[in-house]
């Protein structure tokens, strides 16, 4: 089997929405199986005014990131679909739908979205280095979305793999001064290994068991603070993608953002994404090696405050 692994039951030609689920990994592996309080003139704290979307939040304002900036921030999407033959990687069909849906979802949250297709390792590093060197003083946060093949700790450019940390560390507090104390969000759709999640039966599942497939630079803070990494899967495992419908993780993320992105805190959003991916998706294939597999996303947060868009 070449390219990504496949997994959706059908016969003959498949429609765009009924194509096989695939994984973002090497073919040879898969074959082996809040706003801050403001000071009044008298020195008393003035609570920030609440919009209709957040007036029912019971949160201490100083524990929320300040989003009261001219811009929400920049969102960079790197969408790698086609790879050089030397990488041994197949075409990531379905990723264009992911990129398009992500662009719409993040624009609706107020981000300035920029999408870059089929970038080499050097291109990705240059692109994000330039972004880190920009002046983000008028922005509340920064987001980056990587859509590609991957392995644990690695993301693939069109010409091969590179360490994810070589991209993310460009935005550390000691390198990107204008994002100090502001949330830096990374969403990564890629495999992190070659294991399959077989899933397990539970007696406490949902009733319907049908499965488808601020910154405040006056304080000294750690350089690694205020990062959030949302991975499509846990370390060591495959990440599934359908060539017609897009990836399980990205489509679930977009769905939750579209419905709750302006009401819920970021960890609430991502917890719901975890639930949707874990309960609503299961791979199906005529090949039993790739059938009835599951997936659970993984969130790694170094955020120091609550984040509401």
UniProtKB/Swiss-Prot annotation:
Residues 1-24, 204-214 form a propeptide. Keywords: Allosteric enzyme, Apoptosis, Cytoplasm, Hydrolase, Nucleus, Protease, RNA-binding, Secreted, Thiol protease, Zymogen. One of its GO terms (cellular component) is nucleus. Its EC number is 3.4.22.60. During activation, the N-terminal disordered prodomain is removed by cleavage. Concomitantly, double cleavage gives rise to a large Caspase-7 subunit p20 and a small Caspase-7 subunit p11. The two large and two small subunits then assemble to form the active CASP7 complex. Can be cleaved and activated by different caspases, depending on the context. Cleaved and activated by initiator caspases (CASP8 and/or CASP9), leading to execution phase of apoptosis. Cleavage and maturation by GZMB regulates granzyme-mediated programmed cell death. Cleavage and maturation by CASP1 regulates pyroptosis. SUPFAM superfamilies: Caspase-like. Residues 192-201 are annotated as: Loop L2. It is an enzyme of class 3 (hydrolase). Gene3D superfamilies: 3.40.50.1460. Transmembrane segments: none annotated. One of its GO terms (biological process) is proteolysis. InterPro entries: Caspase-like_dom_sf (IPR029030), Caspase_cys_AS (IPR033139), Caspase_his_AS (IPR016129), Pept_C14 (IPR002398), Pept_C14_caspase (IPR011600), Pept_C14_p10 (IPR002138), Pept_C14_p20 (IPR001309), Pept_C14A (IPR015917). It holds the Pfam family Peptidase_C14. The record marks 192, 231 as: Involved in allosteric regulation. Residues 282-296 are annotated as: Loop L4. It is found in: Cytoplasm, Cytosol; Nucleus; Secreted, Extracellular space. Coiled coil: none annotated. The active site is at 149, 191. Heterotetramer that consists of two anti-parallel arranged heterodimers, each one formed by a 20 kDa (p20) and a 11 kDa (p11) subunit. Thiol protease involved in different programmed cell death processes, such as apoptosis, pyroptosis or granzyme-mediated programmed cell death, by proteolytically cleaving target proteins. Has a marked preference for Asp-Glu-Val-Asp (DEVD) consensus sequences, with some plasticity for alternate non-canonical sequences. Its involvement in the different programmed cell death processes is probably determined by upstream proteases that activate CASP7. Belongs to the peptidase C14A family. This is Caspase-7. It comes from Gallus gallus (Chicken). The gene is CASP7.
């Amino acid at each position: 089997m070449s390219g990504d692994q496949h997994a959706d039951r059908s016969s003959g030609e498949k429609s765009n929405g009924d194509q096989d689920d695939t994984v973002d990994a090497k073919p040879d592996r898969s074959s082996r199986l809040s706003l801050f309080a403001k000071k009044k003139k008298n020195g008393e704290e003035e609570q920030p005014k609440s919009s209709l979307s957040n007036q029912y939040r019971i949160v201490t304002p100083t524990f929320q990131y300040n989003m009261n900036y001219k811009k929400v921030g920049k969102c960079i999407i790197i969408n790698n679909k086609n790879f050089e033959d030397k990488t041994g990687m197949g075409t990531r069909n379905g990723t264009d739908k992911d990129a398009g849906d992500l662009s719409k979802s993040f624009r609706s949250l107020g981000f300035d979205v920029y999408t870059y297709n089929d970038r080499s390792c050097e291109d990705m590093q240059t692109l994000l280095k330039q972004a880190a060197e920009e002046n983000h003083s008028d922005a509340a946060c920064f987001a980056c979305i990587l859509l590609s093949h991957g392995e644990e700790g690695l993301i693939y450019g069109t010409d091969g793999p590179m360490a994810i940390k070589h991209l993310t560390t460009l935005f550390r507090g000691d390198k990107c001064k204008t994002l100090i104390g502001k949330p830096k969000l990374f969403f990564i759709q890629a495999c992190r290994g070659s294991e399959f999640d077989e899933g397990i039966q539970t007696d406490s599942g949902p009733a319907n068991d049908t499965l488808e497939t601020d910154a405040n630079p006056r304080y000294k803070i750690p350089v690694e603070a205020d990062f959030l990494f949302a991975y499509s899967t846990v370390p060591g495992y495959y990440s599934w993608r359908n060539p017609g419908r897009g990836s399980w993780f990205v489509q679930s993320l977009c769905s939750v953002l579209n419905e709750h992105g302006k009401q819920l805190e970021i960890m609430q959003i991502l917890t719901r994404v975890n639930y949707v991916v874990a309960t609503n998706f299961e791979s199906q294939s005529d090949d039993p090696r790739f059938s009835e597999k599951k997936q659970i996303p993984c969130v790694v947060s170094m955020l120091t405050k609550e984040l509401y868009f």
